[in-house]
Amino acid sequence: MSNAPSEEEVLSVEHYTERLFKFTCTRPQSFRFRSGEFIMIGLPGENGKPLLRAYSVASPNWDDTLEFYSIKVADGPLTSKLQKIKAGDRVLLGKKPVGTLVLDALKPGKRLYMFSTGTGFAPFASLIRDPETY
């Protein structure tokens, strides 16, 4: 089994502001993650090596597609290119999701308060759409 990232098709892109956008892509059948985890996402680099950065998965673990939020950084090595993707383009998806903002790490209780700004909302979006949270 290769550790190389898989190529996934971009299904949709939505630009919310001049600094924030979201995109969805296909999800390999074998890709498993826990709601709240992050994964390496990227594009091919100019030197032939993948240019990857960590992105929290915003979709719940039961969804057939993967959803991500990103900020736009004009001179960012990855985001300067990623912000220009459109439906039909390809992105690279790492093989191993990781993270500690998962249901197993949350203490049981009546209320769960989540605070974030910008793209920090992504793992919360995953968790609040997971029926196991309730």
Q: What is each model feature region?
A:
Residues S2-D89:
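Ferredoxin-reductase
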Residues P77-Y134:
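FNR/FR-type flavoprotein reductase catalytic core
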